[in-house]
Amino acid sequence: DSPEVNFGCSPPADDPAVSPSLLDRKKARYYHGGDLAGVIERLPYLKDLGVTALWLNPWYDNHNRLNQIETYENQPITDYHGYGATDFYGVEEHFGDLTALQRLVEAAHRLGLKVIQDQVANHTGPYHVWVKDPPTPSWYNGSQEKHLANVWQVWTLADPRATPQETKATLEGWFANILPDLNQNDEEVRRYLIQNTLWWVGATGLDGIRQDTWPYVPRDFWRDWMAAI
């Protein structure tokens, strides 16, 4: 497993006014601190450890209140993990802002370190504005009221004997039955996701991308995505 590192917060980032009361180290699945400024400060330490690249958790902006849809032990949680994006062009305020991110990449490069972005092309968070107002009728596979649940059967995508139902649920099912599944067969969705990746590369100078939940996305999308990059 990859080691997980949490580096301290500057005071303004502890509990941002736009998303209050989501940082509490005594509660599981809350923000526990750690921001981009803290990572910048510790870059020499990471360099001395022999680290060559930083793979950060997704820095997309996430829901600014407790998540009442995704729960833990029947209690609402925060989207501390970063995989429930509400703005694919925003930086989560608990971590910092775009300027801080650009400074991090620049500082890492000065030390010969690379920065990897964790992206999510498969789904959005359940609180994204698109869920209630999708840009196109086929933006998502299904709706919050009616959709398939993901059955995690990745093998079906390579097995000609797999049932169409299992294959469809694997590609179009909502992750954990709560994360709205983007329809990459919609040309506008495809264009948006590719342009978003190109924007992050250009805006930050990042060095690599890790795609979350990539097996649940049509392979022809990845063909176009990789060709564009």
Over which residues does each language-model region extend?
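Substrate-binding/active-site clefts of carbohydrate-active enzymes
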Residues: D1-W199, A203-T204, D224-I229
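Acidic-and-aromatic substrate-binding clefts and catalytic sites of carbohydrate-active enzymes
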Residues: H94-D97, W214-D220
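Short catalytic-loop micro-motif centered on adjacent basic/acidic residues
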Residues: I116, G208-W214
